[in-house]
Structures are given as structure tokens and as C-alpha cells.
């Protein structure tokens, strides 16, 4: 089973940030949630919840 989460960035920013700590079991549910929740000038990306992505986006202190 794969799990997913949503990250976002302002269109003028370079790096994505964690949007919410909600985990989804279906990629399309994560994308739908992100689209409904985002402001206009933001981009979203749905990522697989794995060790690499967790370390990159969830551990804000390490960035």
C-alpha cells in the first residue's frame, strides 16, 4: 500500500513546503484535497510518503 501527502509552494518560490500533515491512501484523494485547499498563486505536488520525502519535507529543522 502506498501513502501520499501534499506539498505546496508559491509560484515565485523555488522550494516546496509541507502543506498539511494529513496522509492519504489514494493519490487522487490527495490531489483533490490539495486543489480544493490551495490559493490561486500556489502550486501543489502530491508525493509518495517514503523515507526520502519524509526527511525532506516533514523535518523542517533539518532544512
Placement of each model-derived feature along the sequence:
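A short, exposed loop/beta-hairpin motif centered on an aromatic-Gly-Thr core
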Residues: 15-28, 37, 43
Amino acid at each position: 500500500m502506498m501513502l501520499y501527502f501534499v506539498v505546496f509552494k508559491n509560484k515565485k518560490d523555488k522550494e516546496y513546503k509541507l502543506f498539511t500533515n494529513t496522509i492519504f491512501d489514494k493519490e487522487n484523494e490527495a490531489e483533490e484535497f490539495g486543489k480544493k485547499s490551495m490559493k490561486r498563486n500556489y502550486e501543489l505536488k502530491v508525493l509518495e510518503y517514503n523515507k526520502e520525502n519524509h526527511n525532506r519535507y516533514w523535518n523542517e529543522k533539518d532544512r
